[in-house]
Curated annotation (Swiss-Prot):
Record GO biological process: isopentenyl diphosphate biosynthetic process, methylerythritol 4-phosphate pathway; terpenoid biosynthetic process
Membrane-spanning segments: none
Subunit structure: Homotrimer.
InterPro entries recorded: MECDP_synthase (IPR003526), MECDP_synthase_CS (IPR020555), MECDP_synthase_sf (IPR036571)
Function: Involved in the biosynthesis of isopentenyl diphosphate (IPP) and dimethylallyl diphosphate (DMAPP), two major building blocks of isoprenoid compounds. Catalyzes the conversion of 4-diphosphocytidyl-2-C-methyl-D-erythritol 2-phosphate (CDP-ME2P) to 2-C-methyl-D-erythritol 2,4-cyclodiphosphate (ME-CPP) with a corresponding release of cytidine 5-monophosphate (CMP).
Cofactor note: Binds 1 divalent metal cation per subunit.
EC assignment: 4.6.1.12
UniProt binding sites for a divalent metal cation: 12, 14, 46
Protein name in UniProt: 2-C-methyl-D-erythritol 2,4-cyclodiphosphate synthase
Necessary cofactors: a divalent metal cation
Protein keywords: Isoprene biosynthesis, Lyase, Metal-binding
Amino acid sequence: MTMSIRIGNGYDIHRLVSDRALILGGVHIPHELGLLGHSDADVLTHAIMDAMLGALSLGDIGHYFPPTDPQWAGADSLVLLSQVNELIRTQGWRIGNIDSVVVAERPKLKPHIKTMRDKLADILQLEPNQIGVKATTNEKLGPVGREEGICAYAVVLLVSSDEIS
């Protein structure tokens, strides 16, 4: 059975450490801590990529950009996102919309949301109103609440290119 829409969800979490930049949605966020990871550790962009891949049963970002491969060390996650977007397009799909949430106790993310949406929209060839980015805290619960890390969740709706034509 061929379906004209697909939905995927994604999640990512990285540890907060000193001496790293905090990048979310491709935006450098001023903060005394940054996220530790093989690439730039952009949890929002990683969650979106996993949702895109999951919607088409194409695995996860670790399959395409393994953390054991030195070629991806320090990689800009927006470059990886562009590659994932090209992959789903070659499979005959386009993004209908994205909804996401970043969970962090600090810093306050609201002032950066529009810039994140605009950057993601540019990379994904979408209108900013097709991308929802929200921020919340974990009410001081768990590792995110203790400010040990930041996590993000994303849901992506893919639409068959045949439906768009």
